[in-house]
Amino acid sequence: MFRPAIQKLSSLILMAVFCVVMTIISYNSQLDYKKPHYDKKVQAANYMFESLKVLRREYKDIPMPIKSQADQSNNANVTDLNDIESKRSFSSLDPLETGLVFYQDGLPGNPSSKLTTLNPNFAALVVDLMIEAGVKVPEERKRKPKVAVAFSSSFPGANLAVLSACKTLDVEPVVITSLSGSNYGAIDYDQFSWLDMEKKLIDSKIFPSTYKSKAVSIGRGNDSGIGLDSLTIKAIKGAINKHDIDFIYNEKEIEMEYYIDKRMETYFNRNDNAPYDLFINVGGGHASIGASNEIRNSPGFLSLEYLDEIYKDNTDDCAMFRFSQKESTPAINIIDIEKLVEDSVPIINLSDKKFKIDWSSNKWINLDEGSQLWRSEYNKSGILFLERKYNFWVVIPCLLASLLVVLSVGIYSHFQIKRRMTSYEPDSI
């Protein structure tokens, strides 16, 4: 019995197989295209990796109390220097083995947020944010931007990322640090505070001396240590006294306005009273971003329009309020880390063993690493640096070939039927 080609099982199977093959070829034709400023983001990630390695070595060389591993959870700030071991080991709370994660009973803190910012790729994310905020790369500008920065010891990783991004983009940061921190941050005030880390990096020529914090405060409630116990405040003051740095503190002043005034005074004195191009906040310091839930739930680049809308009915005084409303300076808010990173950087948990840092490597990323940046689905490194697209010169021919095969069989079958109908053969009916 007569059957046109399009009704034959063999023809249908061959067409289906051909189309599936074309689909597979198209799917596997993906190419990696470098995202804008690829080189800068790679450079920033490598700077951060280098700084992490320096601090890791420094941490391992710091003597530790024999019982401190067990006692650390009771009090991270008290050290018996008469009873020490020669080397420190890495805490189970520090799965990346950075030496920058510390714990003290009674302090709040989200370990995932702190660990996630210790990924060197976080510096590449900060480069993206700064460029989004209007900071141009050195090759595209006529003057060096000035950036006001507020650091917190809660996020040593984010602090390193900001410094690495500033170095990459050749930006001059004016930094003020709140030395108190939350759990899983840089809260070993006696031996390895953020100021100690900062000094080590500058002494090691990782960052220029101009990147040193221009002033420091205790932080916490009203930026003056409210809510901290006396031993912790004593440890913080001791850590500050080891360094030649302006200390924003007055025992007679407990009002927030005083500490905000002093911060703004420092920022502008250190910049010859010139305006800033950007304000970058790290952490949840009250003097920096106030107590507004809207700001605390708004990570990333905050445009002037966005800040104007937030502060329209909100006069919560803080550095961010003054920069945006009085100086017309936009901001980057590095807070609520899980919301900030979205899918660009993996969230690292205490129990997660998938993400690792190869401390033996000379660089975190090589410029010519290309598709290897997708080496781990969990790492998701490629998302920040590369964009995967289907190869136009493969996909279109495959599509046209599939259409051509189907149309050819259809047209051929049409003429088969037409010839059969005009032949007047009974078997054709």
Feature annotation, model-predicted:
Residues 1-8, 386-388:
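Short, Lys/Arg-rich N-terminal segment immediately upstream of the first membrane anchor
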Residues 10-27, 401-406:
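Hydrophobic membrane-insertion alpha-helices, especially the h-region
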Residues 20, 24-120, 124, 416-419:
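Short, compositionally biased "basic patch" segments
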Residues 121-124, 130-192:
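Membrane-embedded segments
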Residues 148-150, 278-282:
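Structural motif
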Residues 153-157, 180-184, 223, 285-288, ...:
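Solvent-exposed loop/turn segments at secondary-structure junctions
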Residues 190-279:
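A substrate-binding/cap region within the structured catalytic cores of diverse enzymes
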Residues 278, 285-429:
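C-terminal functional extensions of proteins
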